[in-house]
Amino acid sequence: MSSFEYDQIDCETRSIRLLRVLPGRFKDDIECELFLTFIDDVVPYEALSYCWGTEDEGTAPIVLDGSDFFVWKNLYEALRRLRSTDIVRIFWIDAICINQQNPGEKIHQIGQMSSIYQRAERVVVWLGPSDRESDRALSSISSLAKGTAHTVSPSDVKGKRELYIGLCQLKRRPYFKRMWVLQELANARALVVACGSHLLTPTFSVALKVSLKGLKTISRNPTARNTYYY
């Protein structure tokens, strides 16, 4: 299979590329298509907010317009999780929609990022793969978002400890250290958070803020770890 080559983008206009993620099962090859459009066109799309990854994590191939295209493993996992089994999803993803080897194009596209995130139907936050601690924390925060839980039971010592550990793990994730996070989230019309197989509603973002605020209190007062309330 040949390597991918970008079509030229018009840097004199408000043009962007969008990515069609074709439907498939979890273990199928990831197949995508790029197309050119303009920010002001009425094309429904989602914008992905995520952490690129590092060289240590390596890359994995997707099929882009019939050619091999390598992406960082974290983005690969995001595409696997976010891909639908039956419909095409359209995303704006910087690592794919911008030709990273073209400095002039990068400057042009970065200058439009606020508009790109504002125009998106929603911003999808990818926190990365889940683990046992994050599953526990996300489940608890999700319950808070739904209004079904406001405290960790005082008798549930193990639960409080696991929630504390889970929140610490979440806060240490590379995503929260990205300098673009505030701009991307501030411009979002709607927000969905994904972590592994978890896909959480917009109210989750509010609950996450409450939980992380509570985490700061716990961190300053170790005894509060045994009496943690949302």
Predicted segments with their positions:
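Hydrophobic "anchor" residues on beta-strands that sit immediately upstream
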Residues: I90
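Metal-ion-coordinating, acidic/His-rich active-site neighborhoods
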Residues: S2-I16, R20-A47, C51-V71, A78-I87, ...
